[in-house]
Amino acid sequence: MRGLFVGRFQPVHNGHLKALEYVFEEVEEVIIGIGSAQVSHTLKNPFTTSERMEMLIRALDEKGIPRGKYFLVALPDINFNSIWAPYVEAIVPKFDIVFTGNSLVAQLFRERGYKVIVQPMFRKDILSATEIRRRMIEDQTWEELVPKSVVEYIKEIKGVERIKMLATDLEKNEKELQTPLRIPEF
């Protein structure tokens, strides 16, 4: 049996891995859909699809999950909820069951006749990508919330620096740069 699990993975964290561990116990193969695949270099979606794929591969390798047990599939947004499930069906290989922590995703796939297992979020108070990005911006400890291999990769690609840059008020900085210098008169 093949399952579907969709996330944005901005970045991959221990909550994602906990959910995926459960999915791998339930099915032989997993399709991991990488949502918002067309978006990167924004505060909400700082990492590219290929960077998120690399994070997933490294994290699953670290957990000892064989690469032959999963597929990674990029899922660009369509912003049209009523046709999102058939859109996903058209992009990914055939699947039998959907695993999600999102009630809308659950409803959309139930309407298509799929069995859906709604997973409780594991420590959602701290194991959320939003919280991890916030900690990065504020120079707080974030490393224990993500797999070691993902910490290493984020450092390799200077991901924290990217997120901090995205969090700055670029518009204000641009205006300051374009303001003519006033030379004081003596």
Swiss-Prot record:
Sorted keywords for this record are:
ATP-binding, Cytoplasm, NAD, Nucleotide-binding, Nucleotidyltransferase, Pyridine nucleotide biosynthesis, Transferase
Q: Which SUPFAM superfamilies match?
A: Nucleotidylyl transferase
Name the Pfam families for this protein.
Answer: CTP_transf_like (PF01467)
Q: Which Gene3D superfamilies does its entry note?
A: HUPs
An example GO CC term for this entry is:
cytoplasm
The cellular location(s) given in this protein's UniProt record come to:
Cytoplasm
Write one Gene Ontology MF term: ATP binding
Q: Does the keyword ATP-binding apply?
A: yes
Similarity comment text for this entry:
Belongs to the archaeal NMN adenylyltransferase family.
Please report any disulfide bonds recorded for this protein chain, giving both cysteine positions. none
The identity of this protein, by name, is: Nicotinamide-nucleotide adenylyltransferase
Task: Look up the record and give one Gene Ontology term from the biological process aspect.
Answer: NAD biosynthetic process
EC no. given is 2.7.7.1
Indicate where this protein is primarily found.
cytoplasm
**Pathway, per record:** Cofactor biosynthesis; NAD(+) biosynthesis; NAD(+) from nicotinamide D-ribonucleotide: step 1/1
Reaction(s) catalysed (UniProt annotation): beta-nicotinamide D-ribonucleotide + ATP + H(+) = diphosphate + NAD(+)
Taxonomic lineage from the root: Archaea, Methanobacteriati, Methanobacteriota, Thermococci, Thermococcales
InterPro entries tied to this protein: Cyt_trans-like, NMN_Atrans_arc, Rossmann-like_a/b/a_fold
